[in-house]
Design a protein with these regions (language model features):
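Extended amphipathic ligand-handling, pore-lining, and cofactor/metal-binding catalytic surfaces
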Residues: 1-179
Length: 179
């Protein structure tokens, strides 16, 4: 049986984010990274698709430095639902095959200034496993429920008031994700 310590010397975790020009987004992802690292012991980095640093390739370099015997990177897009970024952009940026044809550029020849054309190549000889988007995980549903209940308990509405709950999400250009 392989021990967790042996795995920690060979496997690292890459949390993939879209990236934002707003500094609090980076602070939030670094906090998630630090909490995950502390809870699991696995070397963990955040890699950003665009706008923020480190890039996905830069984060892979950081993991290689932190784990000299690195054999495998488990990459998870920190996205709620599958879409263009999780199925096309992130696999491409990791040097993997996209999971489907890009409706923005079906021939795969992106314009010279497109971020997929100008991104650094990932330099890693080991295995990269790309996990799916987070999806409707029960733990996420618990967080949503807790936040809504906190809001309702802080509400100044009386018991006769009617309250609706609206979940807002980004959406996707993919045909099967238009609901």
């Amino acid at each position: 049986m392989v021990s967790n310590l042996e795995l920690q010397n060979k496997i690292a975790i890459l949390l993939v984010s879209h990236g934002s020009s707003l500094p609090f987004a980076e602070v939030t992802f670094n906090e998630i990274k630090d909490k995950f690292n502390k809870a699991t012991g696995f070397a963990t980095e955040v890699g950003y698709m665009k706008v923020a640093e480190p890039s996905i390739a830069g984060a892979v370099e950081n993991l290689k430095e932190e784990v000299p015997e690195l054999e495998k990177i488990i990459a998870i897009p920190v996205f709620l639902a599958p879409g263009i970024h999780t199925n096309i952009d992130i696999p491409t940026l990791l040097g993997l095959s996209p999971l489907e044809t890009d409706p923005r550029c079906p021939d795969g020849n992106y314009p010279d200034d497109h971020y997929l054309s100008i991104a650094e190549d990932v330099d890693f000889d080991g295995d990269i496993e790309l996990l799916p988007a987070i999806g409707p995980d029960d733990n996420l549903l618990e967080v949503i429920d807790k936040r809504i209940n906190e809001s309702l308990s802080d509400s100044k509405l009386n018991g006769d008031a009617k309250t609706g709950i609206l979940l807002v999400s980004h959406g996707s250009r993919l045909k099967y994700n238009k609901e």
